[in-house]
């Protein structure tokens, strides 16, 4: 620990015979409020947002501009009515990235989304979800914009009907090309119907594979 700040979160320390001690204490409390159970509003914005909420934190990516110039890899915290204070994240620090809806771990340079472990030499185990909203069109099948990632181990695909599906179909299936019912068959068309397409064992896709919805009986 230095004479002026704590080693991990760089909280300012009150100095002997310091005037206006409350300023230093308030700054430390504000930093604690932002850094404990850390939530990053984003780790991808390359410039500060126009009107950040006081205390909101952001992960500054490489090459950031504006007020974030030269702050690559640091945590930017909105403070003092439009200004910014910065903190140095440590390897292994965890955060929830709000605009991505995923937890992330700092690997010493970047926030790794979905990381469950970080190896000494750069390996990692990651888990993540992807979510889309799909509007159906007329036809026997619809290929969604959700692609199962190449090299990823898939454990399931879930779906929910938010508005009743109209037309002559009696039900629908959820799957991928060559396995149109892999994640569900005879699925309902009424609002609130859903598919819990859990696989009996994880499956790896080696090429990007779109999730496909197929009508039955229509």
Regions found by a protein language model. Name each.
Residues 1-9, 13-49, 90, 101-140:
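Glycine-rich, low-complexity segments
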Residues 140-177:
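Beta-rich globular "head" domains
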Residues 42-47, 79-85, 196-198:
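Short alpha-helix capping/helix-loop boundary micro-motifs
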Residues 33-37, 57-117:
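Short, surface-exposed terminal/edge motifs of secreted or surface/virion proteins that either
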Residues 63-66, 101, 162-167, 179:
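Acidic glycine-/aspartate-rich tracts in secreted/extracellular proteins
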Residues 138-147, 191-198:
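Short beta-strands within extracellular/lumenal beta-sheet-rich domains
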Residues 202-218:
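Noncatalytic modules at the cell exterior or secretory-pathway interfaces
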Residues 164-206:
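Terminal beta-strand-rich extracellular "head" domains
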